[in-house]
C-alpha cells in the first residue's frame, strides 16, 4: 500500500522522472485490511470508511487483469514500472543502488516502504498446520482451512486475533484463543476499556484462555506453558508484526530499537534522498510529543503524500507529517474505530454503557481530547477526529452524555 501510494502521489505532484515500484510479492499491490476483516469470511462484507471501494475489493482485484489493482491504480497509465516478486536484499547508499537478488537498481531518490513482517513463534515456520496472516498468499492458504470448519487455535487476542476469531467462528470452526497476558488487547488499550471485550469471545462461542503461554507449536496443536496440550487442525499465530528492515543492516540507515526506520518530520531518513513510509517507519509527532510507529492502513495511505511532496518540490516548506492516527476493526458483530493516541490521556470519559452494543470512550489531557474509541458510534469517531485535529477542549459532563453530539461538548 505505502509504496503504491507513493508512486501515485509522485505523479500527482507532477514528478516527471522514472518511477519503479519494487515488491517482494508476485501480486500487484492490494489492500491488506480485507485479509483479516473480510477476505477469510464466507461472505466478504463491509467497507473501509476511509478508503474508496469495498473492503473486499483489494484482494479480489489483486489477482485481476494486469494494469488494474484493488487499489484502483492503473500503473501503466501512470508510467510506473512494476518489479514484482523481487525482494530488496541490501542498500548500497554510497553507490545509490538497491540490490534485489542479482539485480542492482540505481536511484536518485529512494522510498523505503517494506512494511512489517508477522511475528511468529519458535518453530512455527516449519511446523505443518501453523499459519500467520500478513499477505494474500497467507490468506489463500488459510481460507480452505477455515472453510472446512475444523478446530482452530488462535495465538494472540489483539486486533488481528479478534478478527481471525470472528472469521473462524462465522465459518463454523470451534475456536480456542490463547493470550499470554491477562486480557484481550492488553498491549493496545487500558484494562478498564478492554474489560467488556473478553465477553465478546464468549458471546461468539469462542474459548478464551488468558494468562496462558504457548511453550511450543506442534503438528496438530500447541503445547502450553503448564504442560497441557490443545489439539487443533490449524494454529494461527497473531501476536503482532515487526518492521521489515533487516535488509538495511550496514546501509547507514538509522534504525530505532524496535527495528523501525528512524524518519524525521518529513519522513526523511539519516541518508540523503532516502525516505521511509508506512509500517516500517517511525516519526516524531509534535502533536503527541513522542515518536510514533503506526501499523495501520491510514498511516500507509497518508504518509506517501508527504514524501512525494518533498521529493517533487525539494523545499523545506513542504508540510510535516503529524497525523491523527486512525484505524478500524470489525469483530464479533461490532464496528470499532479509534482515532488519536491515548498514552498521554489523564482522564477517561465514557459515552454510553460499555456493556451495550454501542458506546465510546474519550481520553482527555488537560481537558483536551487526545484519543477516542468508538464502538458502533461512527458519528462520535468522525466528530472526535476533527476535534483532536484542532486540539479542542471538551466539557467532560456534556461529553459523557451520549445523547449530546460530541462536537457540542467542545468549549
Question: PLM features: residue spans?
Answer:
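FAD-binding core/adjacent interface of flavoenzyme oxidoreductases
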Residues: 51-59, 68-151, 223, 236-238, ...
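Beta1-alpha1 glycine-rich phosphate/pyrophosphate-binding loop at the start
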Residues: 1-81, 167-188
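C-terminal catalytic lobe of FAD-dependent flavoproteins
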Residues: 228-256, 333-411
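Short loop/edge segments at beta-strand edges and connector loops
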Residues: 84-86, 92-93, 134, 179, ...
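Glycine-rich Rossmann-fold phosphate-binding loop(s) that bind the pyrophosphate
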Residues: 1-2, 24, 134, 155-158
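Mid-to-C-terminal Rossmann-like scaffold of FAD/NAD(P)H-dependent oxidoreductases
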Residues: 280-378
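Rossmann-like dinucleotide-binding cores of NAD(P)H-dependent redox enzymes
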Residues: 66-68, 151, 159-215, 323-327
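FAD-site-proximal beta/loop scaffold in flavoenzymes
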Residues: 126-149, 221-223, 229-301, 306
